[in-house]
Amino acid sequence: MTNPKFFRMALVLGLLSAIGPFAIDMYLPALPAIGVALHTDTHAVQMSLMAFFVSFAISQIVYGPASDIFGRKPPLYAGIALFVIGSIGCALAPDIVWLIAFRFLQGLGGGAPIVVPRAIVRDLHTGAEATQLMAMLMLVFSVSPILAPLIGSLIIDAAGWRAIFWVVSAIGVIGLVLVAFTLEETRPAAQRAQSDVASTLRAFALLLRDPHFIGLTAIGAFGMAAFFIYLANSSFVLIEHYGLTPRQYSLAFAVNAASFIGVSQFAGKLAERYGLPRIVSVALLGFAASMVVLATLNFAGIDGLAPMIAVLLIGFGFLGLVVPTTSVMALDDHGEIAGAASALMGTLQLVLGALVIAVMGVFVDGTARPMVAGIAVVAVIAWVLSRWTLGSRPRETAPA
């Protein structure tokens, strides 16, 4: 697990996986400015984020099985090319309707570089090794939440919000170059020959009948829904409610993202020592407890920026252990249909995230309360689901 090829693969897959998140995170500091420039309200601007998540989810149900049938690289070419076209459209959008439409197109392409790398991880490794590679991949692509908002705020200051989408377009082109010159095909021709549309439908049916897969996917979905709530609301809360500048907001966002990333890097080592189920159980308990504490403080009138950042730092650290471990556990039993499994998992998680963003938009009131309450609710749901899912399957013992 320490050879150069392992690290090189993590770097390439991480950079590809970062393409979609960059399209989300880089424009977060610009959300209030976009609303002003396009003469629209907060909820309408949030719909541009929801549109991306919806199409991002839909596309995964296509790219995952396609990567089983045609190999891992062709869907990457098609998806990233579509992503670049959508990004250019966003840069040229004359109003909020066109921005939402091109964000939808951007998301349709952006699904490929997020779902295919997960399938490649399963092609190459299982268990603790897969967890280690998934965590390293997350380290690379999760640099996006740290750097992208800061880069976005600098671009806004220098050239305005539209320039953000020109930069994102260039990132997509770089992704095409990476696929062409640095990525090897990991889906053998013999396995591709065994895959077709009918087998994909059978694979989906098999996965939907697997309560362990569905349970783990749901845990990850509600865990990520907490982060989606933060993505959709944090710029308005921190900039408009707490009075931060876009650059200050990007730094505050980076602090919490760094916690998520940093802790995730211990997932592989902890899995080797304690086993995946125990890691998920403890991490979800800590995540839910910290988010409930945050909501309680806020509703008790302790509405300070420092307490919020501090508690989110702790909570997102726990979440950093949940995401890679639940992904690996969900895919471990389905290596022969890893593309379909990865696609279905990603689709279900993102659809839930989009629905949560839409619902949360109704409760926006200019304060932090809807955001912290929403995060606490989905965190508790994730913890409850873990009690059912992990309790319905024989406990995995830690390696000796």
Over which residues does each language-model region extend?
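A late C-terminal transmembrane helix in Major Facilitator Superfamily
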Residues: 328-366, 375
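Helix-loop-helix hairpin linking two adjacent transmembrane segments in secondary transporters
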Residues: 98, 136-181
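Paired small-residue
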Residues: 82, 86-89, 97-105, 306-312
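Juxtamembrane intracellular "pre-TM" segments in multi-pass secondary transporters
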Residues: 1-2, 186-217
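Conserved MFS/SLC helix-loop-helix module at the cytosolic interface between two early adjacent transmembrane helices
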Residues: 58-97
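Cytoplasmic helix-loop-helix junction between adjacent transmembrane helices
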Residues: 102-143
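Helix-to-loop junctions at the C-terminal end of transmembrane segments
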Residues: 60-71, 263-276
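Helix-breaking motifs and short loop linkers at transmembrane-helix boundaries and internal kinks
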Residues: 37-39, 71, 92-98, 109, ...
